[in-house]
Amino acid sequence: MDEQTTKDHIQAHADAVVRGDMDTVIADLSAELQPQAPQLAAGLPMPVTEAEVLSLDFAEDESVAQIRYTGDSGAVTLRSRWQDGDEHPVIVHVEPVG
């Protein structure tokens, strides 16, 4: 994985969540995770008003990001594993932290 490309894409993903750009958010999910998008979105505070990439760990074949999403109803931090997709990095696993 290219570190800078991955870092930029993960930040763009977090920004898309704040904008409510669900087409972009879903496109960042692996084909296996896309059907779970409604359940994943339901776990976020609504509306999401801020997303902060707290950490990003790079490895050769995947990267792990922790992103805190904040909204009117509170905040949640998610850990996501990213791998290279056909056109851009995609999320292959996501889970709440804590």
Where are these regions (language model features)?
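Short solvent-exposed beta->alpha transition segments
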Residues: 7-8, 12-15, 19-61
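TPR-adjacent "capping" and linker segments in tetratricopeptide-repeat scaffold/adaptor proteins
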Residues: 1-4
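Surface-exposed, charged secondary-structure patches
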Residues: 37-86, 91-98
